């Protein structure tokens, strides 16, 4: 192999010991001398693997409760030594070359994620010797292999088996990149953690004692796929994902069939899935260009799909469909026999439904798994030269949060539709207006520059599909600055309104609702979406 290097001596020191016994046994069987530290050394010895403790190798004991183990010239000289250049000085100082370093780091992320984690706990889980060895081996990848991921053990062993115990330069270089990615992520986590423990700073900072937003944001995403193009065909694109995401998402979903997801597919599927997660009853959300164009809940997902689809069949063409229950055969048949769809995503897919969808080979079918509570990730938006960072909009309202501000009280049925409509409005681009009747959208007005025009668009959409607006409720993601939005809603037949309130002209808006005999409730919470 080109620029291959034989592996004769390896240093193994891992916190995550998954797979290390089998890996070490194979190295030993291939005649590789193994050095190790602390718990790793003990584990290998207990499994009858020939191993030398690092302190015996260096002649210098572990000290300071294990804080100093591998920080020794015999270790770092062996890792950093340049083959063909440093042999004389190595011989003079009794330093032997180390050809393979296998290290993963103290579990800092897991430690600080514990509710009872103290600052002292966090500090003691900051690895020093590990990253030092990792960086040293990665720097000297010309001569040394560095393994930080247990998933690479089989790959390394296979190459050694096929190439007389040697690793090619290409492999060592690739492993070095992974090593630097690993240490960058590790140091970033530490910086983020400590950054939340000091006063905020920067323009307009109020100097809080602690801030959930760190001084710097260090994030790492790994490329999941390259794409044919981005939002438009002249834009290149790729999809990157975070490590260890626990929440069901488009990033973690399994694609069961269909063409590769496009940039727009992923963006729209994310919007559909996050919306359908809001509902506990069987629900269907149909999305086009990241806006819900039809949403419904029902006793089963087939009826929910029927309700969502009839809101706007025209926009549903080529859309994304999300469910919060397993996709069954009847629902799958209803979809594929009726409309062209880009993506269907559900927690799971029945075998019968999968067979039906398979008749449309290009249709992308995703299973995202069940979900529980949403995680508290940041919502991040890129602007030229910076990032806008905020909490995710997980604001919820219940019946107890609603303030009736009109003379007429909403009926029980209206209240149920109001809360449903409010959930949908959170996922519609501002200015957002949503008409709802009987747990299904009737009209959606999205993205207009004036709120009254969003209300008019919702009415036009409903009329185009011959849907009866009379008796529907209306939600608005932000307050009405003028009464014209209420007048437009009344003209369309809206009976009840839910909105945040808070306008300087609230009294005029309330008076307009009273004039039209409408009920109206304030939530005290806004749901702008840009």
Swiss-Prot record:
Pathway: Purine metabolism; IMP biosynthesis via de novo pathway; 5-formamido-1-(5-phospho-D-ribosyl)imidazole-4-carboxamide from 5-amino-1-(5-phospho-D-ribosyl)imidazole-4-carboxamide (10-formyl THF route): step 1/1; Purine metabolism; IMP biosynthesis via de novo pathway; IMP from 5-formamido-1-(5-phospho-D-ribosyl)imidazole-4-carboxamide: step 1/1. Gene3D superfamilies: 3.40.140.20, Methylglyoxal synthase-like domain. One of its GO terms (molecular function) is phosphoribosylaminoimidazolecarboxamide formyltransferase activity. Keywords: Hydrolase, Multifunctional enzyme, Purine biosynthesis, Transferase. Residues 1-148 form the MGS-like domain. Its EC number is 2.1.2.3, 3.5.4.10. InterPro entries: AICAR_Tfase_dup_dom_sf (IPR024051), Cytidine_deaminase-like (IPR016193), MGS-like_dom (IPR011607), MGS-like_dom_sf (IPR036914), PurH-like (IPR002695). It catalyses: (6R)-10-formyltetrahydrofolate + 5-amino-1-(5-phospho-beta-D-ribosyl)imidazole-4-carboxamide = 5-formamido-1-(5-phospho-D-ribosyl)imidazole-4-carboxamide + (6S)-5,6,7,8-tetrahydrofolate; IMP + H2O = 5-formamido-1-(5-phospho-D-ribosyl)imidazole-4-carboxamide. GO terms for biological process: 'de novo' IMP biosynthetic process. GO terms for cellular component: cytosol. Signal peptide: none annotated. It holds the Pfam family AICARFT_IMPCHas. NCBIfam families: PRK00881.1 (NF002049), purH (TIGR00355). The IMP cyclohydrolase activity resides in the N-terminal region. Belongs to the PurH family. This is Bifunctional purine biosynthesis protein PurH. It comes from Psychromonas ingrahamii (strain DSM 17664 / CCUG 51855 / 37).
């Amino acid at each position: 192999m080109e620029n291959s290097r034989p592996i004769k001596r390896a240093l193994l020191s891992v916190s995550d010991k998954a797979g290390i016994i089998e890996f070490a046994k194979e190295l030993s069987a291939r005649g590789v001398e193994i050095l190790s530290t602390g718990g790793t050394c003990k584990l290998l010895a207990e499994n009858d693997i020939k191993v030398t403790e690092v302190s015996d190798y260096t002649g210098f004991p572990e000290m300071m409760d294990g804080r100093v183990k591998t920080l020794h010239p015999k270790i770092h000289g062996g890792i950093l030594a340049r083959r063909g250049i440093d042999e004389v000085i190595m011989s003079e100082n009794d330093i032997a070359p180390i050809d393979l370093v296998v290290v993963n780091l103290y579990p800092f992320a897991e430690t600080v994620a514990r509710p009872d984690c103290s600052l002292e706990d966090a500090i003691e889980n900051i690895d020093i010797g590990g990253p030092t060895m990792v960086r040293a081996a990665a720097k000297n990848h010309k001569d040394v292999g560095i393994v930080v991921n247990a998933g690479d053990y089989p790959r390394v062993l296979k190459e050694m088996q096929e190439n007389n115990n040697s690793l090619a330069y290409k492999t060592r270089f690739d492993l070095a990149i992974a090593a630097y990615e690993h240490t960058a992520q590790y140091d970033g986590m530490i910086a983020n953690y400590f950054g939340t423990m000091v006063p905020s700073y920067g323009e307009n900072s109020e100097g809080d004692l602690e801030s959930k937003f760190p001084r710097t944001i260090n994030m790492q995403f790994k490329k999941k796929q390259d794409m044919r193009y981005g939002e438009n065909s002249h834009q290149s694109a790729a999809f990157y994902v975070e490590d260890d995401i626990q929440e069901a998402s488009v990033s973690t979903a399994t694609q069961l069939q269909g063409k590769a997801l496009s940039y727009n597919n992923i963006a729209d599927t994310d919007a559909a899935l996050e919306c359908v997660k809001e509902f506990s009853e069987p629900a269907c959300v149909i999305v086009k260009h990241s806006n819900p164009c039809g949403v419904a809940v029902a006793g089963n997902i087939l009826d929910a799909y029927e309700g969502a689809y009839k809101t706007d069949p025209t926009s549903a063409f080529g859309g994304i469909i999300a469910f919060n229950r397993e996709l069954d055969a009847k629902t799958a048949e209803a979809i594929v026999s009726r409309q062209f769809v880009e993506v269907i995503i559900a927690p799971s897919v029945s075998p019968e439904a999968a067979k039906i969808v398979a008749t449309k080979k290009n249709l992308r079918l995703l299973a995202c798994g069940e979900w529980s509570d949403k995680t508290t990730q940041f919502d991040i938006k890129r602007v030229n030269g910076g990032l806008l960072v905020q909490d995710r909009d997980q604001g919820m309202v219940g019946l107890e949060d609603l303030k009736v501000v009109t003379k007429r009280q909403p009926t029980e049925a209206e209240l149920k539709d109001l809360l449903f409509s409010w959930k949908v409005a959170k996922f519609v681009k501002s200015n957002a207006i949503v008409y709802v009747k009987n747990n299904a959208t009737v009209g959606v007005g999205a993205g207009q520059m004036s709120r009254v025009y969003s209300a008019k668009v919702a009415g036009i959409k409903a009329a185009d599909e011959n849907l009866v607006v009379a008796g529907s409720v209306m939600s608005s993601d932000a307050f009405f600055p003028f009464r014209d939005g209420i007048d437009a809603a009344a003209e369309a037949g809206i009976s009840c309104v839910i909105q945040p309130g808070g306008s300087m002209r609230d009294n005029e808006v309330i008076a307009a609702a009273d004039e039209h005999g409408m009920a109206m409730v304030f939530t005290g919470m806004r749901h702008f979406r840009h």
